[in-house]
């Protein structure tokens, strides 16, 4: 389908900042012979572009973030952009909904993609369907980079929480 990656020579998991520039690559035709017919090539293109573009946005915050946050929020952006495609429902089998006792922040076994339903719940619970601000707020709290969201200056680190703690604090606010 596609991928998003950084070629930023300064991006490093051991550096003081975890933000990185990014570029995305998408398949050139989403041919049914390659991807099947569960969606049209245009639908595959739409959800893949939304998903990968959101990864590029995530890289601005922290490209080494937990997979459940990265993939789950990218999946929910597919739903935001192309709600009628419903490709993301294919991942509900690997979610806390269908596997009681599995942590919502599990980052393996496909559960990182199935976490989208948790993010969708938060968006709907906040009545933010048109503008899912809660997702941005959680990314800002979890960011490894200094992001000036409080007017304290770009060199003031006020975030850098683990993803689950960032989500908990934003929801509790």
Where are each of the predicted segments found?
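Beta/coil-rich, acidic/histidine-enriched accessory regions frequently appended to metallopeptidases
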Residues: 145-173
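Generic, well-ordered alpha-helical scaffold segments in large soluble proteins
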Residues: 56, 122-125
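Structural helix-adjacent loops and short alpha-helical linkers that scaffold large soluble proteins
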Residues: 82-88, 125-135
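Post-HExxH zinc-binding segment in Zn-dependent metallohydrolases
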Residues: 64-110, 116, 120
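Stable alpha-helical elements in mature extracytoplasmic
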Residues: 41, 45, 49-53, 69-73, ...
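Juxtacatalytic substrate-recognition/specificity segment
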Residues: 1-66, 73, 84-87, 98-101
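Secretory-pathway/luminal and periplasmic proteins that interact with or process carbohydrate-rich
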Residues: 81-86, 144-150
């Amino acid at each position: 389908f596609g991928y998003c990656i950084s070629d930023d020579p300064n991006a490093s998991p051991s550096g003081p900042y975890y933000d990185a520039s990014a570029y995305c690559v998408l398949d050139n035709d989403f041919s049914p012979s390659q991807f099947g017919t569960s969606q049209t090539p245009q639908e595959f293109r739409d959800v893949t572009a939304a998903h990968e573009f959101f990864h590029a946005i995530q890289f601005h915050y922290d490209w080494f973030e937990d997979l459940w946050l990265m993939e789950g929020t990218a999946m929910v952006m597919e739903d935001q952009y192309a709600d009628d495609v419903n490709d993301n429902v294919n991942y509900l089998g690997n979610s806390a909904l269908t596997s009681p006792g599995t942590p919502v922040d599990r980052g393996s076994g496909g559960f990182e993609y199935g976490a989208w339903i948790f993010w969708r719940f938060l968006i709907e619970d906040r009545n933010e369907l048109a503008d899912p601000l809660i997702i941005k707020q959680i990314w800002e709290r979890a960011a490894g980079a200094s992001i000036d969201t409080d007017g304290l200056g770009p060199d003031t680190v006020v975030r850098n929480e683990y993803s689950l703690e960032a989500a908990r604090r934003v929801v509790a606010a």
